[in-house]
Amino acid sequence: NRDWAWQTQTESDSRIKLYNQWLPHIHVDFHEQGINSPYYFAPAAEPFHEYITDWQRELQTMIGKNHAKYFDKNNWLYFTKEVFDLLYPSYGDTYPTYNGAIGMTYEQAGHSRGGLAIETEDGDTLTLLDRITHHYTTGLSTVEVASQNVNRIVDEFVKFFSEGKNNPKGEYNTYIISKSNHIDKLNDLQSWLD
C-alpha cells in the first residue's frame, strides 16, 4: 500500500505495470482499519498538494456526499477530511491522483481482528456482512457518481495530461542524464520509467 511510487517490491512493480496499461480515470483503494473506527471515505484531509487539480477535489467531494447520503439513510457511522491526506505520493490513492485520476482510499473497520463478527469497544457488534456491505455501497456509489459525470471525467483526464505536456507546473521541464553513468543504472531507470 505504501510502495506505489517507489516500487521496491515485486508486487508493486507488477501492480504499476498493470495500472499504467489501464490508466483508470477513478481508482479506489479499499482498505480495513482498526475495529473501533467508523468508515472513512473522501474527501481527503487538508492541506491538498498544490498539483491536485480543482476538478480532482470537486469530484472527490461529490462522491463523498453521495456516500454520505447512503450512510445517513442506513445510520452507519463515517468520517471524512480528518485523517487521510493526499500528500505522500506512494499510496493507493495519491499515486493515481498524481497521475491524473481521482484517487481515493475507503477505510472500513475490521482489519485482521474482525473475523466473522467482533464486539467493538462501545459494545456494538461488527460483522463481516457489515464490512462487505459498507464497501459494496461505497463502490456502487462511486460508480453512480462516475456515470453521472462521465463526459467531464474523461475531459478532465485528457486536460490533465495535455496541461502536463504543454504547460507543466514544475520548475523543470527536462532532465538530462549523463551517458557516463553505469549502463546498469541507466537500464534500471529506463525500466522503471517504462
Language-model-detected regions and their locations in the chain:
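Structured catalytic-domain cores with a bias toward divalent-metal coordination
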Residues: N1-D194
